């Protein structure tokens, strides 16, 4: 079992520093869930009730969240997104990385170094699909020594059982039978949080 107290301490120091800088510059910070209620108003629901903020202009920097697919049991603690993977609570013996992008490969590299057996499934014909094919070709040759790469393959079903996460796939490199994994990292992209703010109002 891994302890994340040091990481949490660093995060607390960084966020505390930012809060201090904001206070020093007389920036008012309102914590809570905000939604636009009009062209020049925002309502924030926090622990102490609702606060209405009036403004002339607004900068939306709401970040993003991982894409979730309906057939994946995301509520199971063995099904991870990138934030879960960074918690490093345990090192799975066998880890499936869904998505051959930067985040998935980076996390796969970390867990391989810690001792995990890594499978990577990517629906396109190369990892990091947006990158230059010549560069990716060299990179793929290198990581193929560490990972079991399944290109032109996609996940069709994910089932959580007591002894593991069972994953069915189809495509060029798909195994004929469902595969059992100790954990599955879903790294298939992210979507912006802007829609949650009712910015259209």
Question: Which role does the model predict for each range below?
Answer:
Residues 62-116, 121, 149, 200-201:
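Glycine-rich dinucleotide-binding loop and its adjacent helix/turn
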Residues 28-31, 35-46, 53, 115-201:
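A Rossmann-like FAD-binding core segment of flavoenzymes
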Residues 14, 18-22, 27-33:
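Extended, small-residue-rich solenoid/repeat segments and analogous flexible loops
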Residues 5, 60-61, 97, 186-187:
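Redox-cofactor binding/interface segments in oxidoreductases and associated redox assembly factors
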């Amino acid at each position: 079992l891994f302890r994340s107290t040091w990481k949490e301490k660093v995060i607390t120091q960084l966020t505390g520093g930012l809060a201090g800088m904001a206070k020093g510059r007389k920036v008012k910070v309102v914590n809570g869930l905000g939604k636009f209620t009009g062209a020049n108003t925002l309502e924030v629901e926090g622990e102490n009730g609702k606060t209405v903020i009036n403004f002339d202009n607004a900068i939306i920097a709401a970040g993003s969240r991982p894409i979730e697919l309906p057939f994946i049991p995301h509520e199971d603690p063995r099904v991870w997104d990138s934030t879960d993977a960074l918690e490093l609570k345990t090192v799975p013996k066998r880890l499936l990385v869904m998505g051959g992008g930067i985040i998935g490969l980076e996390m796969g590299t970390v867990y391989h170094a810690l001792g995990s057996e890594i499978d990577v499934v990517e629906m396109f014909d190369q990892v990091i699909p947006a990158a230059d094919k010549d560069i990716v070709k060299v990179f793929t040759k290198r990581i193929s020594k560490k990972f079991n790469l399944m290109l032109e393959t996609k996940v069709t079903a994910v089932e959580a059982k007591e002894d593991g996460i069972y994953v069915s796939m189809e495509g060029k490199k798909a195994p004929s039978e469902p595969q059992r994994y100790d954990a599955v990292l879903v790294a298939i992209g992210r979507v912006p949080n802007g829609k949650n703010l009712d910015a259209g109002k």
